């Protein structure tokens, strides 16, 4: 039910003071003036509160239960982050304020930038991108500017592995590049022979995630970096899986030239589902001049914004409207410290491998052996045996109060789950997940129709995904 459906004529939730201004005129063009009142819902304050409180109770989140969504790092977000972000000194400031009145905010962003550079092994960083994919596009635009600045106009291609995030080829195409996909080797990693076949002087960038989306560390990364640089290409790091290597190694040490981060993954800020988010981009020295404006700089003991960067790719958004997300990430890093971040990465890998062994007794692991922070399993055998698909198992997990893992991704594994437990989950939680998964597999063999009909206990049962994609409804249809 939408809020429009509980609207009643004459109900009021807020009252404006009387307008004492008698003579005024609205200096707007005629075509911008409304011809009728907006059709806002007429509801009381208690109606609004109850409506949205009831809706929120139907949500599932990391504060409710286990959320093993692979490649998403759904770790628990410590509440101290929220406490600090709610300080009035942070929450009540405005982008239009004079710089001298927001020195604390500018210092926080400057220090966050410096910390992220240290963590990733980059030389400079921008905090402007408002999400991971936005950062990804920013990084690709920087690479384009770099090649064009050298008069190198023949570089029109970006290489991505077949296990890459879908945003990688999308960002490359949006920036005007052709995308070359290379097949993974039998071990799930980049096949150097396949890479060598397509790597030439027309390639601008190689985009990689390390560990990759199969949860495997690209052990040949130094060789890949050398191959890229020998051909004049840049090496781009998708930071989706940075959590696994915190304190152990850094993208910059592996030979990457550009990094984008997802603060909502590694650095414990909320998954905004559309915003606000934050996708900082780090670069090596030779690319720093291309970073977007404005850049946060420190001049003596003062902080300000610098717009004077002639070779910058320019503006990629207007304001730091997602500042509170940066406050949360800053708080998390400061709270954890170097040792704490390293421990988090170690525990993420330990939890993933513990759960991998548990799950391997129930379903096949796509690429057996030690994984990093996540692993990919497949129920293809069960599907052939019973007709129960990964989607059915995912829906049945919801009945047991557990969010389903990522499914059907990467695309190179069939009927698969990508499972990432993160470091914040206990052994008890992992054991419980494995027990429930085993129970569902037994249900699938004994009563497949039961699993195919799931979920049964959720506020909304199976959605019509096809209709939602092809015939989306974006607005309420009023009855005339």
UniProtKB/Swiss-Prot annotation:
Assembly: The glycine cleavage system is composed of four proteins: P, T, L and H. In this organism, the P 'protein' is a heterodimer of two subunits.
Reaction equation(s) it catalyzes: N(6)-[(R)-lipoyl]-L-lysyl-[glycine-cleavage complex H protein] + glycine + H(+) = N(6)-[(R)-S(8)-aminomethyldihydrolipoyl]-L-lysyl-[glycine-cleavage complex H protein] + CO2
Disulphide-bonded residues: none
Example of a GO biological process term: glycine decarboxylation via glycine cleavage system
Identification of the protein by name: Probable glycine dehydrogenase (decarboxylating) subunit 2
MF annotations from Gene Ontology: glycine binding; glycine dehydrogenase (decarboxylating) activity; pyridoxal phosphate binding
PANTHER family, per the entry: GLYCINE DEHYDROGENASE (DECARBOXYLATING), MITOCHONDRIAL, GLYCINE DEHYDROGENASE, DECARBOXYLATING
Keywords, in A-Z order: Oxidoreductase, Pyridoxal phosphate
Function: The glycine cleavage system catalyzes the degradation of glycine. The P protein binds the alpha-amino group of glycine through its pyridoxal phosphate cofactor; CO(2) is released and the remaining methylamine moiety is then transferred to the lipoamide cofactor of the H protein.
This protein's record includes keyword Oxidoreductase: yes
Cellular compartments per GO CC: cytosol; glycine cleavage complex
Residues modified to N6-(pyridoxal phosphate)lysine: 265
Superkingdom of origin organism: Bacteria
Gene behind this protein: gcvPB
Cofactor(s) in the UniProt record: pyridoxal 5'-phosphate
Annotated SUPFAM superfamilies: PLP-dependent transferases
Entry annotated with the keyword Oxidoreductase: yes
Homology family: Belongs to the GcvP family. C-terminal subunit subfamily.
Entry's EC annotation: 1.4.4.2
Broad enzyme group: oxidoreductase
């Amino acid at each position: 039910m939408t809020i429009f459906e509980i609207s009643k004529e004459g109900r009021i939730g807020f009252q404006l003071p009387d307008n004492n201004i008698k003579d005024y005129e609205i200096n707007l063009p005629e075509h911008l003036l409304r011809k009728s009142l907006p059709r806002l819902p007429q509801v009381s304050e208690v109606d609004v509160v109850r409506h949205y409180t009831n809706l929120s109770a139907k949500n599932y989140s990391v504060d409710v239960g286990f959320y093993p969504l692979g490649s998403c790092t759904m770790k628990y977000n410590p509440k101290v982050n929220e406490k600090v972000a709610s300080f009035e000194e942070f929450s009540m400031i405005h982008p239009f304020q004079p710089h001298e009145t927001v020195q604390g905010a500018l210092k926080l962003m400057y220090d966050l930038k410096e910390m992220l550079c240290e963590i990733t092994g980059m030389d400079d960083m921008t905090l402007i991108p408002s999400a991971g994919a936005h950062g990804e596009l920013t990084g690709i635009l920087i690479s384009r500017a770099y090649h064009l600045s050298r008069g190198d106009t023949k570089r029109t291609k970006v290489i991505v592995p077949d296990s890459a995030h879908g945003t990688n080829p999308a960002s490359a195409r949006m920036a005007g590049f052709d995308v070359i996909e290379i097949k993974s080797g039998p071990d799930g990693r980049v096949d150097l022979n396949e890479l060598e076949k397509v790597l030439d002087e027309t390639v601008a960038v190689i985009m990689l995630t390390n560990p990759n989306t199969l949860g495997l560390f690209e052990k040949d990364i130094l060789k890949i970096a050398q191959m890229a640089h020998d051909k004049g290409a840049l090496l781009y790091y998708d930071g989706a899986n940075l959590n696994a290597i915190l304190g152990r190694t850094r993208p910059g040490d592996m030979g990457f030239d550009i990094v984008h981060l997802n603060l909502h993954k590694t650095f414990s800020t909320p998954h905004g589902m559309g915003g606000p988010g934050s996708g900082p981009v780090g670069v090596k020295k030779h690319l720093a001049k291309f970073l977007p404006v404005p850049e946060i700089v420190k001049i003596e003991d003062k902080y300000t914004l610098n717009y004077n960067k002639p070779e910058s790719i320019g503006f990629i958004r207007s304001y730091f409207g997602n500042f509170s997300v940066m406050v949360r990430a800053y708080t998390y890093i400061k709270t954890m410290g170097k040792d704490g971040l390293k421990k988090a990465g170690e525990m993420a890998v330990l939890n993933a491998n513990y759960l991998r062994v548990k799950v391997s007794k129930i379903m096949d692991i796509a690429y057996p052996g030690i994984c990093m922070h996540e692993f990919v399993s497949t129920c293809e055998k069960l599907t052939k045996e019973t007709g129960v698909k990964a989607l059915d198992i995912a829906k049945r997990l919801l009945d047991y109060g557990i969010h389903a893992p990522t499914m059907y991704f990467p695309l190179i594994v069939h009927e698969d789950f990508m499972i990432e437990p993160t470091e914040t989950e206990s052994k008890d939680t992992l054991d419980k997940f494995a027990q429930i998964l085993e129970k569902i597999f037994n249900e699938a063999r004994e009563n497949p129709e039961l699993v195919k009909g799931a979920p049964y206990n959720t506020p909304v049962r199976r959605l019509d995904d096809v209709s939602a994609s092809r015939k989306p409804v974006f607005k309420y249809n009023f009855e005339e």
